[in-house]
Swiss-Prot record:
Alphabetized PROSITE patterns for the sequence: TUBULIN, TUBULIN_B_AUTOREG
Record-stated family: Belongs to the tubulin family.
Subunit structure: Dimer of alpha and beta chains. A typical microtubule is a hollow water-filled tube with an outer diameter of 25 nm and an inner diameter of 15 nM. Alpha-beta heterodimers associate head-to-tail to form protofilaments running lengthwise along the microtubule wall with the beta-tubulin subunit facing the microtubule plus end conferring a structural polarity. Microtubules usually have 13 protofilaments but different protofilament numbers can be found in some organisms and specialized cells.
Chain residues that bind GTP: 11, 69, 138, 142-144, 204, 226
A GO CC annotation given for this chain: cytosol
Protein purpose: Tubulin is the major constituent of microtubules, a cylinder consisting of laterally associated linear protofilaments composed of alpha- and beta-tubulin heterodimers. Microtubules grow by the addition of GTP-tubulin dimers to the microtubule end, where a stabilizing cap forms. Below the cap, tubulin dimers are in GDP-bound state, owing to GTPase activity of alpha-tubulin.
Protein's UniProt name: Tubulin beta-4 chain
SUPFAM superfamilies for the chain: Tubulin C-terminal domain-like, Tubulin nucleotide-binding domain-like
Length: 444
């Protein structure tokens, strides 16, 4: 079967990951001891995508958990699903990365990376036909960003033909945890552009907004935010885990969403999002789902798709739906908002349908869009980066770990190139495209 190996790193990654496993276990009828207590044969049919079956019919997640300090892991172990993970798969250091990318990537992280790779190798050998990896991490801290990208590049070397998908939490514009976030994020993006296949871009501010506006929560906790993320993560992979009329997997997703290899940063959304009080008043229908799914307020990162154009998009519908109706609604969206789609990629919206809805819902949908407006995120981080780097602020923390200023300059220009590429394809029209391409080829 097409297994996916899940890796979570750093505090943020481990907290998102923990929530994700709660959702996945719930969908497959696995209780917190790893025993199957479900009621449908469909839950077990392809359970091996995310779980190993151990002795005594116990199901163990294919998850590798890493951190440079023991704190988050300890609280995860004592949490509701702490006992389900394989104890050998917890890999942690003691020193912490102190929000320093260089520590995660070059010094502390580099010491721990081999033991992480051993666990990854063991899990990969345990699988029958590994499809790829999914990594949960944040880009603002030290471990998730520095060590996370180090691990991604090592895995890339060892498994070059497997898909690499990341769920990356970007630093958000108004909610900042640390001063050096722009440095860490820029250095990470520099790595992700080269080594990852698909990046789902998330950020806390957009998630807070969804909690306030749509879910009407007065004071949302990180638990609430992570729940949103885990709903999306489960939606992206549901086609692999349950039978469906139109299936997709990580590779199909990539082929349909990535027109140019560097432009693989996606916005994600989930529908239906309703506040707990108002659920009973609305019946779900495909048009309503589609409407909410494409709504700019629903995107889980702080970029507004109305400021750019969609290169491609993909929608995963779950539940007992008619494929015909899904297709009609998707065509409808494209026809009504044709100016928001680039005209030089015809049929650029793909939909897939999975028969099993998430727990407690009749139908749901997950949205993944490759929009040029994501450049807003990179642009914002890049401006903050430049403001500090111009004054060489906080730089000694990085050079002290053996980094070179040159690396910062490279990362900065790579990020700016990425923004320029998005802008170029946003402005391109069907007619002039061929000539531009030719000119560029001669120049290089």
């Amino acid at each position: 079967m097409r297994e996916i190996l899940h890796i979570q790193g750093g505090q943020c990654g481990n907290q998102i990951g923990a929530k994700f496993w709660e959702v996945i276990c719930d969908e497959h009828g696995i209780d917190h001891t790893g025993q199957y207590v479900g009621d449908s044969p469909l839950q077990l049919e392809r359970i091996d995508v995310y779980f190993n079956e151990a002795s005594g019919g116990k199901y163990v997640p294919r998850a590798v958990l890493m951190d440079l300090e023991p704190g988050t892991m300890d609280s995860l172990r004592s949490g509701p699903f702490g006992q389900i993970f394989r104890p050998d798969n917890f890999v942690f250091g003691q020193s912490g990365a102190g929000n320093n990318w260089a520590k995660g990537h070059y010094t502390e992280g580099a010491e721990l990376i081999d033991s992480v790779l051993d666990v990854v190798r063991k899990e990969a050998e345990n699988s029958d036909c590994l499809q790829g990896f999914q990594v949960c991490h944040s880009l603002g801290g030290g471990t998730g960003s520095g060590m996370g990208t180090l691990l991604i590049s090592k895995i890339r070397e060892e498994y070059p033909d497997r898909m690499m998908m990341t769920f990356s939490v970007f630093p958000s514009p108004k909610v900042s945890d640390t001063v050096v976030e722009p440095y860490n994020a820029t250095l990470s993006v520099h790595q992700l552009v080269e080594n990852a296949d698909e990046c789902m871009v998330l950020d806390n501010e957009a998630l807070y907004d969804i909690c306030f506006r749509t879910l009407k929560l007065a004071n949302p906790t990180f638990g609430d935010l992570n729940h949103l993320i885990s709903a999306t993560m489960s939606g992206v992979t549901c086609c692999l885990r349950f039978p469906g009329q139109l299936n997709s997997d990580l590779r199909k997703l990539a082929v349909n969403l990535i027109p140019f290899p560097r432009l693989h940063f996606f916005m994600v959304g989930f529908a239906p999002l309703t506040s707990r009080g108002s659920q009973q008043y609305s019946a779900l229908s495909v048009p309503e789902l589609t409407q909410q799914m494409w709504d700019a307020k629903n995107m889980m990162c702080a970029a507004d798709p109305r400021h750019g154009r969609y290169l491609t998009a993909s929608a995963v519908f779950r539940g007992k739906l008619s494929t015909k109706e899904v297709d009609e609604q998707m065509m409808n969206i494209q026809n009504k908002n044709s100016s928001y789609f680039v005209e030089w990629i015809p049929n650029n919206v793909k939909s897939s349908v999975c028969d099993i809805a998430p727990k407690g819902l009749k139908m749901a949908s997950t949205f993944i869009g490759n929009s040029t407006s994501i450049q807003e995120m990179f642009r914002r981080v890049s401006e903050q980066f430049t403001a500090m780097f111009r004054r060489k602020a906080f730089l000694h923390w990085y050079t002290g770990e053996g980094m070179d200023e040159m690396e910062f300059t490279e990362a900065e220009s790579n990020m700016n190139d990425l923004v320029a590429e998005y802008q170029q394809y946003q402005d391109a029209t069907a007619g002039e495209e061929e000539y531009e391409e030719e000119e560029e080829e001669y120049e290089t």
